[in-house]
Amino acid sequence: MKKTTRRTAGGRGGAGSHELYQRVKKKAGTIKASSRRWLERHLNDPYVHQSKADGYRSRAAYKLIEINERYKILKKGQKIIDLGAAPGGWCQVAARLVESKDYNPSVVGIDYLHMEPLPGVAILEMDFFHEDAPQELISTLGSKPDVVLSDMAAPTTGHRQTDHLRTIALCEAAVHFSISVLKPGGHFLTKTFQGGAEGNLLATLKQNFKKVHHVKPPASRAESVELYLLALQFKGKTD
């Protein structure tokens, strides 16, 4: 199933942090200690508060903002594909920076999870691994992309190496997709987890892009094994 949407009323609101905190306090005795720690950290996170104030759907928006401030990968007039786009924070940032329009979106996001519509973003509600997904993305965008973004990550199990390997598999799929569709000179950004199994992934990126950077933006929590790989200046397909 797919869903293509080209307009929206805006970002997602939600209950205030104080109200949520009060609900958490009342239920503190019924949730696990690990879950309680996560909730407390979430409620005290300045990026969470800022995302609500700025109208972004997730704190992840600031990771892309910070990466872009350093590397300038998103510019006016570009075409963008966002893999694993839900809930839409990266799409919001990309649409703003490339000045995407509702009547002719230059940002396409795909996720099997439901996403509410966003201004200047076409949304495909389908699995990126569906055989029709690559063609649907290009058809919806109307041309090859200048940038492919991927914030995809497999659901975590709590076992670090397992989580690393599962996320690397998603990264590899995103890399092969980007190599098949990017314009020459285009860029690719993907999330990964540190763990030592990314050798082949890095080799593929270095073979196909002029520069590859490991990036950990300030918005990425210091204790997290999360890391971003940024591949710049796609060399072009070699048939």
From Swiss-Prot:
Q: Which GO terms describe its cellular component?
A: cytoplasm
* Keyword Cytoplasm assigned: yes
Q: Does the keyword Methyltransferase apply?
A: yes
**Which intervals of the chain form a coiled coil?**
none
**Catalytic activity entry:** uridine(2552) in 23S rRNA + S-adenosyl-L-methionine = 2'-O-methyluridine(2552) in 23S rRNA + S-adenosyl-L-homocysteine + H(+)
Provide the protein's localization.
Cytoplasm
One Pfam family it belongs to:
FtsJ
Q: Which GO terms describe its molecular function?
A: rRNA (uridine-2'-O-)-methyltransferase activity
Where is S-adenosyl-L-methionine annotated to bind?
A: G88, W90, D111, D127, D151
Active-site residues are K191
For this UniProt record, give its keywords in alphabetical order, as a comma-separated list. Answer: Cytoplasm, Methyltransferase, rRNA processing, S-adenosyl-L-methionine, Transferase
Task: Quote the InterPro entries the UniProt record gives.
Answer: RNA_methyltr_RlmE, RNA_MeTrfase_FtsJ_dom, rRNA-MeTfrase_E, SAM-dependent_MTases_sf
UniProt superkingdom: Bacteria
Q: Which SUPFAM superfamilies match?
A: S-adenosyl-L-methionine-dependent methyltransferases
Q: Gene3D superfamilies of this UniProt entry?
A: Vaccinia Virus protein VP39
**UniProt record similarity statement:** Belongs to the class I-like SAM-binding methyltransferase superfamily. RNA methyltransferase RlmE family.
Protein name, UniProt field:
Ribosomal RNA large subunit methyltransferase E
Q: Which organism is it from?
A: Bartonella bacilliformis (strain ATCC 35685 / KC583 / Herrer 020/F12,63)
Q: Which gene encodes it?
A: rlmE
